[in-house]
């Protein structure tokens, strides 16, 4: 008999906990557990002797929790507290069965959105969740990813019992310039990357939950910087200028009509073009946002921040950007949560509520108040360009790297070549909408799918020739960036202008033997990207087969869904092609890491998502060596371990199956 805590049984449990989340549990065993288990009957099953479970049960019995069949937003303080309470209960469970029993119990009694978020964060962070692949959120809460028109057709198909696949278009029309890049912000894989990163690094995380999230503040900067740089690369690919930053004293130029509805709560609010920022009741005044920004800029200019107890902390040192990231977000890691104020989180609330700032029309939260939907709104990228420029102000205060800072003595990059074609195209992708529609008892499910177009690229391989003149093996870090060569007007960019627009393509470690080394690296092995997640149907089928067959299940290749979709590694480019500089920097791996030459594959997406419960593997600043200003390109040209090659990316306009 296979133990109930093996991967197959755990995957089976999670599948059934998340299936048709707005309806009672279908699995008979879990359904019985939900109605017979008492979370506080035996408190020895928890690491905290049931303190969290008692608190949550008290709130539940006093009817002080958010009702079921109601919208949930992480930016709503009270709802976030409830989610954190449930997460704490699950996180304190000593064994999988206890976590599973609690999850079944609270699934039937708490708000569905709070439950899903808490379960996802628990599986991601708890050791008990190792080996489990969380189903793609676009199949669990499809309303957050799917246009209303498609959801309506899915309901119609269900009611008439007719199978159907419905094409989902990007919201808007060609009259709207922003429509040209809607495929980026509205890509369901990019939405998943964004929401999952914020589950991997929650702004409400406290180390009392079990461990420290290493370099969380710096990763907050780097992940959003890369999203913004990638968005700008897509704009260049569509004859558009880079996105402009948001200004609190200016209008919000682009409106947005989400064409999406909550499962319960009505339509997502719309925002017309050229809206003036308004004070938002219960969130902030416009003046508060300007004050917060000024306080942060003052800290950068002074080179220090003031902690809660009044002492000053120097930010003009290597981990300064880490401290700044925690303050700008702001997270529980902030050195002073009350001063200067929460710029990022409050800004999301401000933008989300501009359609109904005083609550006159009882509108639900806007798309900016959910990490799942935020990147759909063009104002998301304006907001992050604005914050990115604040971070740049900080990094520009550091002295540029010198020849000695950059060199890897005795190592030279002799040649960079690409095997294969750098070709992008759009393909089609189907996902099931079975969980979007309601089911009665004994009513058969109907095969209903949404069909979306997604950016993709042909696979390619980097061939990098590196010579090691040291007459002994060397451990090396290989860093690969893609940098634009010119702006939208065809004006050539120097390296200092281009560096902030560069896309991180890969970062990995390798051993250099004495003499000539040929490093071959496939695009699909990038530490920046993740493959497509298995569909919910596939996860259910594999888990059921493993449980029934009594064998285990290994889905470790898909365990993390934080990372840029691997098909979006390259920017779209144009049919006539666009030239980019491919930069390869080979740096001293012994200096870059803790020096242990063990497994440095790190399985997947460590570049932008780190490694759970461990130190970030690279000691260098994120973005090194391009994160500091470069007043003279010749410093880079003068070191042998950094080289660049001109490459051309071509877009094939033919839609592929």
Curated annotation (Swiss-Prot):
Residues that, per the record, bind Cu cation A: 194, 198, 224
Question: So what does mutating residue 423 to I actually do?
Answer: Depending on subunit
- Compartment(s): Secreted, Extracellular space
- Provide the free-text tissue specificity comment from this protein's UniProt record: Hemolymph.
Effect of mutating residue 421 to R: Depending on subunit
- Kindly state which keywords UniProt assigns to this record, in alphabetical order: Copper, Disulfide bond, Glycoprotein, Metal-binding, Oxygen transport, Secreted, Transport
Q: Which residues, renumbered to this chain, are glycosylated?
A: 167
Outcome of substituting residue 287 to H:
Depending on subunit
Reported impact of residue 174 to K: Depending on subunit
Q: Which Gene3D superfamilies match?
A: Di-copper center containing domain from catechol oxidase (1.10.1280.10), Hemocyanin, C-terminal domain (2.60.40.1520), Hemocyanin, N-terminal domain (1.20.1370.10)
A Pfam family it matches: Hemocyanin_C
Impact after mutating residue 626 to S: Depending on subunit
InterPro entries, alphabetized = Di-copper_centre_dom_sf, Hemocyanin/hexamerin, Hemocyanin/hexamerin_mid_dom, Hemocyanin_C, Hemocyanin_C_sf, Hemocyanin_N, Hemocyanin_N_sf, Ig_E-set
Give the record's GO CC terms.
extracellular region
Provide the binding site for Cu cation B: 344, 348, 384
Q: What is its main location?
A: secreted
Q: Which pairs of positions does the record mark as disulfide bonds? A: 483-502, 562-609
Q: Which family does it belong to?
A: Belongs to the tyrosinase family. Hemocyanin subfamily.
Which PANTHER family is this protein grouped with? FAT-BODY PROTEIN 1-RELATED, LARVAL STORAGE PROTEIN/PHENOLOXIDASE
Role, per record: Hemocyanins are copper-containing oxygen carriers occurring freely dissolved in the hemolymph of many mollusks and arthropods.
Relate the assembly described in the record.
Answer: It consists of at least four very similar subunits.
Name of the featured protein = Hemocyanin
Q: Which organism is it from?
A: Palinurus vulgaris (European spiny lobster)
């Amino acid at each position: 008999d296979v133990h109930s805590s093996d991967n197959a049984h755990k995957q089976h449990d999670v599948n059934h906990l998340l299936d048709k989340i707005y309806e009672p549990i279908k699995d008979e065993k879990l359904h019985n557990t939900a109605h017979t288990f008492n979370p506080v009957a035996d408190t020895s099953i928890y690491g905290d002797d049931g303190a969290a479970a008692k608190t949550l049960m008290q709130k539940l019995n006093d009817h002080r929790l958010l009702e079921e069949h109601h919208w949930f937003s992480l930016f709503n303080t009270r709802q976030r507290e409830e989610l954190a309470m449930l997460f704490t209960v699950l996180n304190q469970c000593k064994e999988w069965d206890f976590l599973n029993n609690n999850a079944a119990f609270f699934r039937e009694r708490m708000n569905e959105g709070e439950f899903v978020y808490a379960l996802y964060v628990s599986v991601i962070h708890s050791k008990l969740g190792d080996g489990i692949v969380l189903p793609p959120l676009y199949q669990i809460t499809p309303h957050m990813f799917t246009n209303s028109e498609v959801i309506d057709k899915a309901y119609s198909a269900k009611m008439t019992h007719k199978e159907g696949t419905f094409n989902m278009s990007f919201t808007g029309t060609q009259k709207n310039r922003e429509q040209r890049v809607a495929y980026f912000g509205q890509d369901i894989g990019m939405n998943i990357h964004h929401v999952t990163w914020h589950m991997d690094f929650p702004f409400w995380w406290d180390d009392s939950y079990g461990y420290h999230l290493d370099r969380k503040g710096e990763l907050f900067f780097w992940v959003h910087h890369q999203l913004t740089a990638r968005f700008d690369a897509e704009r260049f690919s569509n004859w558009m200028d880079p996105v402009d930053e948001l200004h609190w004293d200016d209008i919000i130029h682009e409106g947005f009509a989400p064409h999406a509805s909550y499962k319960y709560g009505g339509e997502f609010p719309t925002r017309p073009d050229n809206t003036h920022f308004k004070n938002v009741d219960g969130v902030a005044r416009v003046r508060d946002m300007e004050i917060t920004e000024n306080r942060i800029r003052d800290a950068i200019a002074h080179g220090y921040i003031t902690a809660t107890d009044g002492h000053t902390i120097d930010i003009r040192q290597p981990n300064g950007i880490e401290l700044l990231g925690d303050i700008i977000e702001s997270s529980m890691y902030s050195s002073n949560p009350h001063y200067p104020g929460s710029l990022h989180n409050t800004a999301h609330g401000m933008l989300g509520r501009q359609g109904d700032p005083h609550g006159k029309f009882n509108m639900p939260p806007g798309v900016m108040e959910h990490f799942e939907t935020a990147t759909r709104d063009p104002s998301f990228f304006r907001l992050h360009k604005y914050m990115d420029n604040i971070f740049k102000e900080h990094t520009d205060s550091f002295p540029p790297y010198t020849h000695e800072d950059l060199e890897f003595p005795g190592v030279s990059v002799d040649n960079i070549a690409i095997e294969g074609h750098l070709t992008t195209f759009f393909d089609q992708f189907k996902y099931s909408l079975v969980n979007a529609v309601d089911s009665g008892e004994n009513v058969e499910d109907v095969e209903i799918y949404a069909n979306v177009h997604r950016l993709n690229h042909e696979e390619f391989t980097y061939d990098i020739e590196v010579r090691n003149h040291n007459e002994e093996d060397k451990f090396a870090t290989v860093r690969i960036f893609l940098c634009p060569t010119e702006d939208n007007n065809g004006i050539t960019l120097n390296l200092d202008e281009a560096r902030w627009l560069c896309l991180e393509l890969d970062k990995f470690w390798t051993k250099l033997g004495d003499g000539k080394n040929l490093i071959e690296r496939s695009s699909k092995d990038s530490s920046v990207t993740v493959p497509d997640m298995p569909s919910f149907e596939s996860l259910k089928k594999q888990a059921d087969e493993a449980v029934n067959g009594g064998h285990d299940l290994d889905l470790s290749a898909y365990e993390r869904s934080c990372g840029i979709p691997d098909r979006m590694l390259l920017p779209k480019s144009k049919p006539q092609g666009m030239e980019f500089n491919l930069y390869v920097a080979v740096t001293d791996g012994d200096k870059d890491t803790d020096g242990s030459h063990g497994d440095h594959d790190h399985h997947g997406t460590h570049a932008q998502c780190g490694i759970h419960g461990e130190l970030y593997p690279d000691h260098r600043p994120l973005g090194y060596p391009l994160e500091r200003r470069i007043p003279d390109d010749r410093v880079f040209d003068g070191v042998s371990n950094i080289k660049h090659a001109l490459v051309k990316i071509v877009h094939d306009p033919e839609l592929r199956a």
